[in-house]
């Protein structure tokens, strides 16, 4: 059973009673997932940019948006219009499929993994986690990468507060660390 199907059939009903809502449309849901990688020092190197684009598109299965500098910053050796990062916004079926792979395949492959921090919510029910290595994803072959680079994954929900967002992600199977 896919995560989207499980959400519609079991998780929604469970959250309806757990959070004591009167209407099924009040139950929080994941609206989008943003995967972002800043290039940092590698911004001057075109090979790193190409590698980041192919890695993120392999992981997410979607075309990558190259983020560019809005203004020149001499201290960071950045000119206006230079590529400084890559980002992907996932919605719909691709979002649920990515979330399922993240929870069931990628996160358990992290070395010394004891769960993700339950404190990484932003106050509005959105969750952000940083991944230090891209090789935790099964789509990335260890032999084909030139450097180990991380990424930021933001799970945006329409929950009103952190408790609702935490309850939603816990029901979806997000392995939160117990502090």
From Swiss-Prot:
Primary location class: plastid
tRNA processing among keywords: no
Xref: Pfam families: Ribosomal_L5, Ribosomal_L5_C
GO molecular function: rRNA binding; structural constituent of ribosome
Keywords annotated in UniProt: Organellar chromatophore, Plastid, Ribonucleoprotein, Ribosomal protein, RNA-binding, rRNA-binding
This protein's GO CC annotations: organellar chromatophore; plastid; ribonucleoprotein complex; ribosome
Localization, UniProt: Plastid, Organellar chromatophore
A Gene Ontology biological process term: translation
Keyword rRNA-binding: yes
Subunit description: Part of the 50S ribosomal subunit; contacts the 5S rRNA.
NCBIfam families on file: PRK00010.1 (NF000585)
Similarity annotation: Belongs to the universal ribosomal protein uL5 family.
Known function: Binds 5S rRNA, forms part of the central protuberance of the 50S subunit.
This protein's name: Large ribosomal subunit protein uL5c
Species of the source: Paulinella chromatophora
Gene expressing this chain: rpl5
